[in-house]
Every structure is written in structure tokens, then in C-alpha cells.
């Protein structure tokens, strides 16, 4: 997902606490005049048969689906093998994320945090819990959800979590996050549909590879980061800090903005930016160390590892059409997954909207959006060679019987995934100092352009993690076996998620970016 680093720089759209109408789909973009007017986050790997790279963002799929070009949907339909950053439908992914976040047995957050910091954190969480009823949408209430349940789904068991994960959890306790519960994010939606269509699915990363670097910060660095996070949230609540971008801006750029815009700048870390020229010198040193550590561990090493595993999967499936869906930030900027593939000799071209996709059942005709069905009743397999023509690019509303809180999108590494998408932007103090404190809505982390020394070019030498670890893959045969004994793996986590995220209260928050994510 850079001059001086300030603590986790949090963005907030300061507005009233009242629940407000959902903005128009597409982040207020105008409907495109033609397919060629759409943004395309699709790249084609030139081989026979072709393979595809598709850039996602971690927002409810209904906000972007109408703006995804038909040829991107056709590439997905034509593929037989679909891969994601993590296997979002595997209960192990969920339980591993939950375990990774917990303090050692017998320890609680109050035991490890300084007293003042702990109580500041608790006051902030109490505030969020108080605000959630006003953030909820009528649709959520109509489905029988209540505020305490939503809060516990995100923040449950927070006193048992490691401080670095609490920091990320706080960043996701926002009005936007609460209001989006109930609709799968784009990545998860594609994963669910791929399994329902009996495609072979898999992942190029393991949970531990995303989780362990976060736990690698030393304790003083973690305290610094958590303190800076709370300072930013407190400033937002006091009305003294404003942010240049929100999730709506991200959606708008994805749907109809500039693909090279700073909001998609991938020269970012997946954690908040910590540098600020007003910090004391010793804190600036700490900020630089954190920034450098995560830039290497969560951006450059990840892109190299992901690129190598893409190549391994292509080698193993030379006669298959493969579709790789990663966060868009992995394909934009410098030292990207695409750079790794090109340096290895593969030919990777951006595929504009409107350009025909050549493959089985995908020669020029747009494919329909995957039909949404209840996770409890998986759709029959849809062979790639029998894809009908599209009738509408608009997805239907998820069925009422689908429990929106227990949907697997709850378990995405949300803060990590969000941060992949955000470019670094400078913050500015509010000019009107006499303005009354405003409510804290749509809180997001933003990252500034760096003036620190750029890292060396992405190395291509084998690394233990990229060479010895094989990607997770689930074949259509395995999916058929699952059908014979119970629900498909895309539906099984619906209940498994709850168990995976209930260490002590019903549903602890698990962090995609995810990422990813």
C-alpha cells in the first residue's frame, strides 16, 4: 500500500454523528459512456493460454462492481484457477489470524501497557461503542443487527490482543467500517464465487507471513506507534485535525480516477506513517526505524515473494488459465509484483477496458457478474466454456438469510488491506480553531510521500520463504468432495468465523489486508 514520519497518521472525515444516506455507488462517479471509458486494473501475462493479474480494493464489492470492465469479468469467468493473497474461505486462515494477535497465555493488555496509555485507549473504545448505534444503517437494523454485536465483532477480546494489533483494530473502528458490515469486500466476493463455480482456488501467502512481521516490532516501538495512533484519533475527535482523503475518495479513484494517482501509490508501508518534523529527535529516529522495517517486510519482501509464487503457479499450470486477484497497490508504483515477473522474463501488459479477452468462452463477449447465492446453498458448477452472455453488470442484493456479521469479510486483515491502497498525503491542521468539536467519522490511515532514501531495487535472489513455501491450492475435485460431506468451503467459514474470532467475547476483530490483505 515520505518525508518526516509522524505517528500513525489517521484520516477522518469530520461530519455529524447521525447516520447519513449511503453515497451513490461508484464514489459519486458518473456512469461511463462506454466500456472503453472505464478504469482497468487488469494485466495479461502473455502465454498460451494467457494468465491474468487483477487489482482489487478492499471495499464492499457493490460499490465498485458496476465500474469493473466487462473484459475483467470475462477473464475471471474464463479462468480455471483463481488465486488470492490469502485463502479467505479457509477456517485455518481465520484461526491463525486470531492466534497471531493474542498476547502470551495469562497476559492482558492492562498488564503490559503504561497505565495512562491503557486508560486513554479504553476511553476511546468506550466512545466508539457509544457512537456505533448512530453509525449503523437502516439496512443493518432491518436485518436484526444491534450495536453491541457489531462492536464485539470488531473489537471483542481486545484486552487479550498484542498492542500492535490493538492499534490496527482502533484504525478500523470507524463509521465507514461499521456501515460496510454485511456486504463482502471485492476480494472475498470473488473468492466465494470462484468456489461456487468450482474453480480451483488458492493463495500465494500464508497468514504467518503477514502476521509475524507485525509482531517483530520491539516493545518501545509498539508503544510509540500506539500512542501516536491515539493522539491522532483524539485530535480528530477534538476537531483539530482533518484528512485529505476518505474511503469514498479511494472508491472514486478506483472507479473513475487516475490509475497513477497518489492514492494508489504502492511505495507505502501497510502501517501508518510515523514521521513528523515536530517530533523530538529521538522519536523521529524511532519513527524512521519503524517505517524502514515495515517498508521492507510488508512491501518489498511481500511483492518479491508473491511474484515468485505467481511464477511457480504458472509453471505448475502451464495449460490452465490462471487469474490472480491481489490488492491494486501490488501492481502500481515501484518494485511491484509486475516488476518481479518482468525481471524474470515474463511479458506482462496492461489490458485496457474494451480490449477483447482471448480464451475459452471469452473472445470479445462480456461475461456476466457471478450470481450471488446464499452461502448455505452453493451454486452449481459453471464451466468456463459454458459462460452465457451478460445480461446485466449489476450484482443482485445478497439474500436476507445470509448473516452479514458472520460473513467472512469480517475476518479480512482490514487495516493492513486498507493501508495497501492509501498513498502518503500531508496532513494539515484545521484553520478554524473555534469550531466546535466534531464527530469522528470515516477514520482512515493515510500515508505521506517519503523523502527518505529509497530502498535498493527489488532483489531477485531466492529467499527461504519464497522458495521453500508452496502456495495453498484447493482444486475443484476437493471442492466436490466437500460438497459430498457438507457445505462448500465458501460457506463453511460463515459459522467457523465466529469460533475463530471468539477468544473471549463473541467476535474479536481480525485484521486484511488486508491488506491484505
Swiss-Prot record:
Residues 20-494 are extracellular. Residues 355-408, 451-491 are annotated as: Disordered. Glycans are attached at residues 227, 334. It is a single-pass type I membrane protein. Residues 366-381 have a biased composition (Pro residues). Its cofactor is Mn(2+); Co(2+). Induction: Transiently induced during 3T3-L1 cell differentiation into adipocytes. In vivo, down-regulated by fasting in both white and brown adipose tissues. High-fat diet down-regulates expression in white adipose tissue and up-regulates it in brown adipose tissue. It is found in: Cell membrane. The keyword rRNA processing does not apply. InterPro entries: TIKI1/2-like, TraB/PrgY/GumN_fam. Residues 1-19 form the signal peptide. Residues 516-517 are cytoplasmic. Its main location: membrane. One of its GO terms (molecular function) is metalloendopeptidase activity. One of its GO terms (cellular component) is nucleoplasm. This is Metalloprotease TIKI2. The gene is Trabd2b.
